[in-house]
């Protein structure tokens, strides 16, 4: 009898809470987000490599919490034209997603990654593709490093929309292009690994993806010298309230900046900030339904990233020259340099990667008596880059022989 009495009271209390209109809101313990895999399915990838990539993606999703109120996944192929293998709302379990990835056919064709990225942007925010509003968005791009079109502009558009970009490159690729494309910091979001060694990074990458989907509290990411991105768990809904973000430079209360955001927002990017400066950040949830405590955070922007300021051309020969630059930045601030050299009149472009801490390199195989444009680009750990250019001219290919002075022959007298 006591059991039925307690059960009846519990059911009555649950019904009363439902009728009262009190909104509990989503909890921060279960990650929510839309995860899009962008796989290079073009002819530049061998069938063996593609099969290894499919196994890798299957490993990633194996233990992730998928479901209508948790994570959702979609897969898009890179080829001559992008192709959706499955949408976000097509599968609701990790096993079903694994099975779909395992049988996904390679599409072949050209490697039009830029076109596929523009398509992925539409998919990530399209309700007809199963995407959800107000949840974190993550894109994982697995590539062999080659692309037939530009990836920079569409990648930047995705990041401007708050999408976190992870890149796994199984080939060399263009270091600067991939650094600029991945979210910051690069050491967390960009991986270079042989296709047979992909399982080595699966656990680390899976954890980073889930962290991006589920911030346990207000936190900062993509910290640069002039801005940073804030993320927080879904504390409100669009109908239950709104947020006020406050940004205060250290010791400058009069310079406070405020931004009001809807209740379904989970991220915001502050820009136009000062380098090497402490900022006090406050997230103030405003709701008439329930009381939520403010969250506070201190963030320090990075120091100004100074790229090459001077280029010196020396040791100029018909088919080679030496390029030096200053200042030489160490590995604490930069990942390295890319030196590019091409004829001003048009022609093939030479490029050399130089490790951090070095500030010179010799470029061989040039054309005699030709003017070149030399560009030195520093790639920073933040994912940004700075470049400086100068002109250089190789020496003539003809060697001028200076005649030796004639000496009097033996037995002859000088007049």
From Swiss-Prot:
Protein name: von Willebrand factor A domain-containing protein 1
Segments forming domain VWFA: 34-213
Subunit structure: Homodimer or homomultimer; disulfide-linked. Interacts with HSPG2.
This protein's record includes keyword Metal-binding: no
Function text: Promotes matrix assembly. Involved in the organization of skeletal muscles and in the formation of neuromuscular junctions.
Domain Fibronectin type-III: 214-305, 307-405
Gene Ontology cellular component list: basement membrane; collagen-containing extracellular matrix; extracellular matrix; extracellular region; interstitial matrix
UniProt-listed CDD domains: FN3 (cd00063)
Coiled coil start-end: none
Cysteines joined through disulfide linkages: 369-393
Residues carrying a glycan: 264
Post-translational modification: N-glycosylated.
Organism: Rattus norvegicus
Origin: domain of life: Eukaryota
Alphabetized UniProt keyword annotations: Basement membrane, Disulfide bond, Extracellular matrix, Glycoprotein, Phosphoprotein, Repeat, Secreted, Signal
One matching Pfam family: fn3
InterPro entries in alphabetical order: ECM_Assembly_Org, FN3_dom, FN3_sf, Ig-like_fold, VWF_A, vWFA_dom_sf
Location of this chain's protein in the cell: Secreted, Extracellular space, Extracellular matrix, Basement membrane
In-chain residues carrying the UniProt-annotated modification Phosphoserine: 74, 80, 93
An example Gene Ontology biological process: extracellular matrix organization
Signal sequence bounds: 1-18
Listed SMART domains: FN3 (SM00060), VWA (SM00327)
